[in-house]
């Protein structure tokens, strides 16, 4: 069975969860309308086998600063903990 895994990340688990492999991370805030709409798009991946990390930008300002996040939602792609790409804004499922 194929599933999507949405993992809430924070200061305590970020490094452990993202240090190995290819990881897609969304930085969001609860007050951002685009972020709420983005969550609906992410939940549309239930028919694929994909791991997506979620970071609340208000709760983890040090991670926002570390990765140079200037707006929400922002996606970063990590390979073995190193940022290899960054995408800012709302994306439909087909664009991700």
Feature map (PLM): residue ranges:
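N-terminal "domain-start" segment that seeds a small globular fold
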Residues: 1-16
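Short active-site neighborhood of thiol/selenol oxidoreductases, capturing the structured segment around
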Residues: 18-30
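Thiol-based oxidoreductase modules, predominantly thioredoxin-like and allied folds used
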Residues: 7-9, 27, 46-63, 69
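Typically the conserved alpha-helix immediately C-terminal to a functionally engaged Cys/Sec
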Residues: 34-48
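Short loop/turn elements that flank and shape the SAM/SAH-binding pocket of Class I
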Residues: 15, 60-63, 94
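Non-catalytic, surface beta->alpha helical segment in thiol-disulfide oxidoreductase systems
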Residues: 71, 76-96
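The canonical Cys-X-X-Cys-His
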Residues: 32-35, 75
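Alpha/beta-hydrolase fold active-site loops
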Residues: 22-23, 49, 73
């Amino acid at each position: 069975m194929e599933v999507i895994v949405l993992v809430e990340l924070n200061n305590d688990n970020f490094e452990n969860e993202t240090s190995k492999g290819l990881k897609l991370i969304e930085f969001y805030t609860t007050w951002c309308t685009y972020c709420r709409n983005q969550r609906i798009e992410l939940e549309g991946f239930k028919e694929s086998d994909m791991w997506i990390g979620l970071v609340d930008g208000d709760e983890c300002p040090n991670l926002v600063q570390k990765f140079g996040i200037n707006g929400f939602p922002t996606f970063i792609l990590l390979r073995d903990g190193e940022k290899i790409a960054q995408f800012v804004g709302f994306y439909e499922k087909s664009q991700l």
